[in-house]
């Protein structure tokens, strides 16, 4: 495997909270995929702070992923096309859908993600990998 790209992002949880207040909670529906949204609602029901931390980590992971694949938040990279879910072991994993999944498959790109949060910040780091030769050329 060759490294296709790396991305990192840090977000201040209070900024996410402010956006949630400003949008009456619609920000979560705009950013989270369907599986993420179910987890968010379950966590938020138990603890508003844990729900907010979950939203902040997923937002951060999407930003880091978009940097790792070199697209930023431009088609086919959309908020809801990429979800960060957890394996049974708890390890986070990225799951792409739709046109983003097709774009990644065409380039042989897979990714690893790590996320962490504290009271004030959430941070994510993504390594995008490819088995294809000439990885640097296919990003263009």
From Swiss-Prot:
GO terms for molecular function: holo-[acyl-carrier-protein] synthase activity; magnesium ion binding. One of its GO terms (biological process) is fatty acid biosynthetic process. Keywords: Cytoplasm, Fatty acid biosynthesis, Fatty acid metabolism, Lipid biosynthesis, Lipid metabolism, Magnesium, Metal-binding, Transferase. GO terms for cellular component: cytoplasm. It holds the Pfam family ACPS. InterPro entries: 4-PPantetheinyl_Trfase_dom, 4-PPantetheinyl_Trfase_dom_sf, ACPS, Ppantetheine-prot_Trfase_dom. Its EC number is 2.7.8.7. Transfers the 4'-phosphopantetheine moiety from coenzyme A to a Ser of acyl-carrier-protein. Belongs to the P-Pant transferase superfamily. AcpS family. NCBIfam families: acpS (TIGR00516), pantethn_trn (TIGR00556). HAMAP family: AcpS. This is Holo-[acyl-carrier-protein] synthase. It comes from Paraburkholderia phytofirmans (strain DSM 17436 / LMG 22146 / PsJN) (Burkholderia phytofirmans). The gene is acpS.
């Amino acid at each position: 495997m060759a490294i296709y790209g790396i991305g990192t992002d840090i977000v201040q949880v209070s900024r996410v909270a402010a956006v949630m207040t400003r949008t009456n909670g619609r920000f979560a529906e705009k950013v989270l995929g369907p599986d993420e949204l179910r987890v968010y609602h379950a966590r938020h029901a138990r603890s508003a702070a844990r729900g907010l931390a979950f939203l902040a980590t997923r937002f951060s992971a999407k930003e880091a992923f978009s940097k790792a694949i070199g697209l930023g938040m431009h088609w086919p990279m959309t908020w809801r096309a990429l979800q960060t879910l957890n394996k049974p072991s708890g390890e986070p994993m990225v799951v792409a859908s739709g046109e983003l999944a097709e774009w990644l498959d065409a380039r042989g790109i897979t990714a690893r993600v790590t996320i962490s949060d504290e009271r004030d910040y959430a941070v994510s780091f993504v390594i995008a990998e490819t088995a294809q030769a000439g990885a640097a050329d296919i990003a263009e």
